[in-house]
Amino acid sequence: MGQDKEQWQEKVDSFWLRICEAVGRDNGLRAVFRRNAGELLQTADGRAVTAFYRLNGGGAVSERNEDRCFFAVCAACLWKADEWTRAVPLTTGARKLNSDDKAAFEKRIRVLLDLPWDDEGYFATKLSRLLKYCKSKNMVVDGKSLMRDLINWDNDERFVQKRWVRELYREETKNSSKGVGENVD
């Protein structure tokens, strides 16, 4: 089982590297994917679908995970390839938002936490809106970590959702734990 997981990780890493190289060389390709941000494969335009399958050449992405990976690729293309160097996982970046922006982020993420990935695109639409909100706050979201999270989103243990919440509140918990249990009179 451990070897299978390692092989899967290598395939995902190899696929993401191909995406980064292709999009880094070709702004037109990035634009094709960017225009389809928030879409699933069945509703995406033909150029984006063709480009995705061409880059997935060796079947690095399983058929079961194609929509999730396509979503992550298109979402990553919301940002320029040269911005990817400062990309951070979704909830890690949110910790740096000011209190009003963080409250708006939390509201959006709470909705996502209870939703399963669906073939109709409801989850994708909600997540796409959250990512566009992040972009408006100058936060670059790491597409590779997003892709891995989406692949594991429906796991029975909900470890992705738990990690998102843990990461979101990690810094706040450290700061607010000072004085917990102290008498303030």
Spans of features found by a protein language model:
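Extracellular/secretory pathway and lumenal proteins
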Residues: 1-2, 138
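N-terminal "first-domain core" detector
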Residues: 2-9
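Basic, alpha-helical nucleic-acid-binding regions used in initiation and control of genome expression
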Residues: 11-74, 78-185
